[in-house]
A protein has these predicted regions:
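Active-site histidine-anchored catalytic micro-motif
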Residues: 2-323
């Protein structure tokens, strides 16, 4: 099938945007998409094509295999002529997926805008599927479509803000202004370019990917040692979520575990539980770890780190040189 480069190619992946009922759950495609298509036809002049997608779910259940599914769906449509994409997904893992896709299409000539909503497009308790004009859903979608027509790259569009997709984070569980990131008015981050492997290899690695996290709490240092000791060979990488600018307790046992993980080629990336400004080597309480092969998360959010690690892992490129 060939696509027109000027058309907007929509992918509906579920989430609050297309949810309905009490409690909310994503509507199946055969019920929701005709309603969405009619709305688009009545309110927009541009032509939209809804791509076939069988992965419609609450975003809290997305896995690496789902991430690579969306990569392949977009890549295939791009090979057939499509250049403008809008992906509607749930907000829980939107930033994780956006980061992954931003690296996947870093050097592509497409426009890909990832969006969602904090409230459903439809009135939740009305069985007639009426549009809720007080919801943020339509505003986010129409803004995303506009961005796909005017910018090239991979973006997150939310609450009238356009962010580079490689480094965003959901910072509010209720309000429409739920995301934070690097606005497109500022330069985007730069990363080493990774040439994608054939999709069968990417798919294989996604099925076995296992990125773990350790969230520090003010417990006895031995608890950190035990959590590190529990990391085994089937782990792809570890995200160490530390205090402040990346501070964490230091002990001989922790150092030994960090050295062990390095010897097993399991990267450990340090980030912060703080939502803004990332980690640094300002304090001795955190800088010591980098002498023991820990990678710095820099100013990347936790979802941004996950997305970058996963893209490197599925392409056999998980190394400090590529980080």
């Amino acid at each position: 099938m060939l696509y027109q480069s000027d058309d907007i190619h929509l992918i509906y992946a579920g989430g609050t945007f297309g949810s309905h009922g009490t409690p909310l759950s994503p509507l199946p495609a055969h019920e929701f998409l005709p309603v969405l298509q009619n709305l688009l036809n009545s309110r927009l002049d541009s032509r939209q094509v809804i791509l076939d997608n069988d992965r419609i779910k609450d975003s809290s259940t997305l896995t690496p295999a789902d991430f690579t599914h969306f990569y392949e769906l977009i890549r295939t449509a791009h090979q057939q002529g499509a250049r403008r994409f809008v992906l509607i997904t749930g907000t829980d893992t939107l930033s994780f997926l956006a980061s992954f896709l931003s690296h996947a299409f870093a050097d592509s000539d497409l426009s890909l805008v990832i969006t969602g909503s904090m409230n459903p497009l439809l009135v939740a308790d009305n069985p007639a599927y009426h549009i809720d004009d007080t919801s943020d859903a339509w505003h986010n979608l129409s803004d995303a479509i506009n961005v796909s027509q005017t910018r090239q790259g991979v973006f997150v569009q939310f609450c009238h803000q356009t962010f580079w997709a490689d480094n965003t984070q959901k910072i509010d569980s209720l309000n429409p202004n739920a995301f934070y990131g690097t606005h497109v008015s500022h330069p985007s981050l730069t990363f080493p370019t990774i040439r994608p492997e054939p999709f069968d290899i990417i798919k294989h690695h996604a099925n076995t990917a296992n990125i773990k996290s350790i969230f520090l709490l003010p417990n006895d240092t031995n608890h950190i040692v035990q959590e590190l000791a529990n990391i085994n060979d089937n782990t792809t990488a570890v995200i160490l979520i530390a205090y402040g600018v990346g501070n964490l307790p230091k002990s001989d046992a922790i150092i030994a575990e960090l050295d062990r993980l390095h010897g097993q080629n399991i990267p450990v990336v340090c980030t912060t539980m703080c939502p803004f400004h990332g980690v640094s080597t300002t304090y001795a309480a955190g800088s010591w770890q980098y002498a023991h092969h820990v990678w710095s998360g820099g100013k990347l959010s936790i979802p941004a780190i996950y997305g970058r690690l996963l893209w490197l892992a599925v392409n056999n490129a998980l190394s400090s040189d590529n980080w």
